[in-house]
A protein has these predicted regions:
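Short, charge- and proline-biased low-complexity linear segments
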Residues: 45-51, 77-82
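Residues at secondary-structure transition points
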Residues: 4, 36-40, 44, 119, ...
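Periplasmic/extracellular, small/polar-rich flexible segments of pilin-like filament-forming proteins
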Residues: 59-179
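Alpha-helix exit/C-cap motif
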Residues: 36-40, 47, 51-72
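N-terminal single-pass transmembrane signal-anchor helix
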Residues: 1-34
């Protein structure tokens, strides 16, 4: 009597179906985890800058002149922008720090003559706003199911999934929540 060793086609099909079911559950869960991690990192960086802004104001009595390049080498003081994550990997969010009243960078900008520029001199630095918006590839959001964030010195902390809805003062009127 000879014994045949191996698996039948039915047994192999069952294994393939089980693996497909596990993958169908695991992959979306992993993607959601990655988006939550990226959002937590964006919130952490926004709160870190907010803390540094308050320290700066305690010493200087104004937010004007704040420059985050001592914290982040990728911070652009002329525009007040920072790519998140800051380690230089694929950008998920763009953080923008501006004066609340003028919507211009808080950093002091100097012209070629060494004097402060007109745009920079219009900044009083009494309040600030931090917008954290999802990065885009062309016109497509990299993480369409994630949030855009808003944080201000006046205590506004909101987030929204609606793209391009975050302004200087609000996260829009629909589909937003506090964080």
């Amino acid at each position: 009597m000879q014994y045949k060793k191996g698996f039948t086609l039915i047994e192999l099909m069952i294994v393939v179906v089980v693996i497909a079911i596990i993958a169908a559950i695991a992959i979306p869960s992993y993607a959601a985890y990655i988006q939550r991690k990226d959002l937590a990192l964006a919130k952490q960086e926004a709160l870190r800058i907010a803390t540094e802004l308050e320290k700066f104001k305690a010493k200087n009595f104004s937010y004007k002149g704040f420059d985050a390049t001592y914290l982040y080498t990728g911070y652009a003081p002329s525009t007040g922008t920072l790519a998140i994550p800051v380690d230089g990997s694929d950008t998920k969010f763009t953080l923008t720090l501006l004066d609340l009243a003028t919507k211009k960078s808080l950093s002091i900008q100097r012209g070629q003559d060494g004097n402060e520029t007109a745009d920079s001199s219009s900044v009083r630095g009494l309040n600030w706003v931090i917008r954290v918006e999802r990065a885009k590839t062309g016109t497509t959001l990299k993480q369409p199911r994630n949030y855009d964030l808003l944080l201000t010195s006046e205590g506004v902390r909101c987030q929204t999934r609606t793209p391009d809805m975050v302004s200087t003062y609000t996260c829009g009127t629909t589909n937003n929540e506090n964080w």
